[in-house]
Amino acid sequence: MELENIVANSLLLKARQGGYGKKSGRSKKWKEILTLPPVSQCSELRHSIEKDYSSLCDKQPIGRRLFRQFCDTKPTLKRHIEFLDAVAEYEVADDEDRSDCGLSILDRFFNDKLAAPLPEIPPDVVTECRLGLKEENPSKKAFEECTRVAHNYLRGEPFEEYQESSYFSQFLQWKWLERQPVTKNTFRHYRVLGKGGFGEVCACQVRATGKMYACKKLQKKRIKKRKGEAMALNEKRILEKVQSRFVVSLAYAYETKDALCLVLTIMNGGDLKFHIYNLGNPGFDEQRAVFYAAELCCGLEDLQRERIVYRDLKPENILLDDRGHIRISDLGLATEIPEGQRVRGRVGTVGYMAPEVVNNEKYTFSPDWWGLGCLIYEMIQGHSPFKKYKEKVKWEEVDQRIKNDTEEYSEKFSEDAKSICRMLLTKNPSKRLGCRGEGAAGVKQHPVFKDINFRRLEANMLEPPFCPDPHAVYCKDVLDIEQFSVVKGIYLDTADEDFYARFATGCVSIPWQNEMIESGCFKDINKSESEEALPLDLDKNIHTPVSRPNRGFFYRLFRRGGCLTMVPSEKEVEPKQC
């Protein structure tokens, strides 16, 4: 019914706009949900957590923030942090400004007249850096050795002092909270957005923070029937491993009675297939296509850095966020390639598989560069290179075209666009752009990307050429999304529990910590950034009393009569739509 779709969309849009609660979608009980434990309760975590400087002080967002707050209390350490921040700004500076920016950093931090220089960085390293900055086109990595020395200094005695500070105790409190169990009640659930191989995808919202996600539900019986345990666990582990601005992130993994759930970055702008074929004439202008291609190149580079080949590049797997940036989604066919090895597998989608995949030959990352060529072609031309949109043709015929035919180019393509497509769609993988030893760096150097500053792109500092309508829901109507049939004859037993335990591991550190910071919950709770007190309770004999909800007269009356059992009160009633 049309009414059902309107209601489902209205609830989703209201949730996206922070329509529930006073704090952008937070539950009325968000502070109770995010209550930090006394420090004494974190003693086991203090001893068991790996004391890795890079992870605790740089990669993990809350750890990075608290380590910097600690450094701010000591002038020498604060100076090092200011230097590292200045270098980060240098690395994303425009090419024409980079030399002046770098020389000003040297003058600011290594001037002989300074009262607070950085003596830990040797003069010869500074001199070499200065010479590099005076070149015509200074490298973005001119300060690489300086930053390495600075981090080596911070990972020594300063890191040890940090571990004895109240800031590290606060970090442990947040890590304790991060490791608490995740259930379906952690979220509000909204309308179905689509469906995958093992189940549906619906929108959801974290009650504590108001953060919106997409929940991919893998039906347990369907997984077991299709023997998909390895595939499901592989996708989960790859998503957990990859932290990229250009690949959907896994934030939570949990289970219900009937499903295994992956909670992923929600992409409200729809997929590229919808935008290519449903908004005006098929295809994009070249500027827009090149921008998306640049972001895809960065995403593939991040995957290949972890030795992962994606193998399923196609428009419906590329999603747009609220601002119009893209991310690669659906990593069900991705696989990790051991160092020095190659893999074989005829997997992918008809019309997008590379010749070496069609021929069932061994490969590493070459299929993804072929896939990028297919996508660039389709974004500009308005159909894929070897199969027109909605063309009725057998898959065997499409495979023959991929192996034997040469793609045709219309007037829509500039010479640079033709060039990169031809180089990426080279039949021989050893001669294909990106596969000749240069990897993503070689693809980025193609003239079609001459106007793209990749450093600024990777830092999320470039505006996309298109911004989705924030009041639109870019997916099929609820009733147009085909529902799964009931799986019969499959029974779950205790033998399946080991697999479920390996899958349902709760929060993923970096996305969860980013959520706490971006939602403002970290700022509101953390004593260093607000006036609210933290339960730092360094005395192990002090215990924080558990607050109990106020009970009414009739509750107390029936309680005395033994008619009631103790259950948590739930005062908030919130919409639920799925």
Curated annotation (Swiss-Prot):
Domain Protein kinase: 187-449
Tissue: Isoform 1, isoform 2, isoform 3, and isoform 4 are expressed in testis. Isoform 4 is expressed in myometrium.
GO MF term (any one): rhodopsin kinase activity
Keyword Kinase applies: yes
UniProt superkingdom: Eukaryota
The protein's role, per its UniProt record: Specifically phosphorylates the activated forms of G protein-coupled receptors. GRK4-alpha can phosphorylate rhodopsin and its activity is inhibited by calmodulin; the other three isoforms do not phosphorylate rhodopsin and do not interact with calmodulin. GRK4-alpha and GRK4-gamma phosphorylate DRD3. Phosphorylates ADRB2.
Family the entry assigns: Belongs to the protein kinase superfamily. AGC Ser/Thr protein kinase family. GPRK subfamily.
Protein name stated in the entry: G protein-coupled receptor kinase 4
Natural source organism: Homo sapiens (Human)
